[in-house]
């Protein structure tokens, strides 16, 4: 029997002899009530136990948006247009907004990768940078002795917005 499996951004074709195949487990298809864009807008209009972002931020504040790097499937490029609109409604200016890709111990992105992650509009309007372990501000030490060092663009922001997704991770 021939099968196609998603692998990276492509497809891996494999053949398994019928005698070696016990069965195939497939996920059930779940119908979405809203499109991705509609869901992002709903989340911004109906925040859980919070004011709307436009009601929290103030004109002139520096805003850091922290998001995942290329190793995670967070659809940052799909979220950013609505998020930027929300921030602008609250009085934020593009020159005061920085999108920070939290790379942790991973390699830095290329400009092309950062642009793809941010999306064309965000890339054109705001500053998009990788976190930098060599440019951190030391905020202190935990009770367990662990140093707390935060990348400068995030530490110096007046407001920090963290984007992320929930996924199985091992």
Question: Which residues are covered by each model-predicted region?
Answer:
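Hydrophobic or amphipathic alpha-helical targeting/insertion segments
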Residues: 86, 90-100, 105
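Histidine-anchored nucleotide/phosphate-binding helix
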Residues: 73-92
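Glycine-rich phosphate/diphosphate-binding loops that line cofactor/substrate pockets in enzymes
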Residues: 48-64, 89-94
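Short alpha-helical segments and helix-capping/turn motifs at coil-helix boundaries
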Residues: 48-51, 82-86, 143-153
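An acidic, phosphate/nucleotide-engaging active-site surface
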Residues: 109-170
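Short glycine-rich or small-residue beta-strand-to-loop segments that form or flank ligand, phosphate
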Residues: 62-73, 98-104, 162
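N-terminal amphipathic/basic leader segments beginning at the initiator methionine
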Residues: 1-43
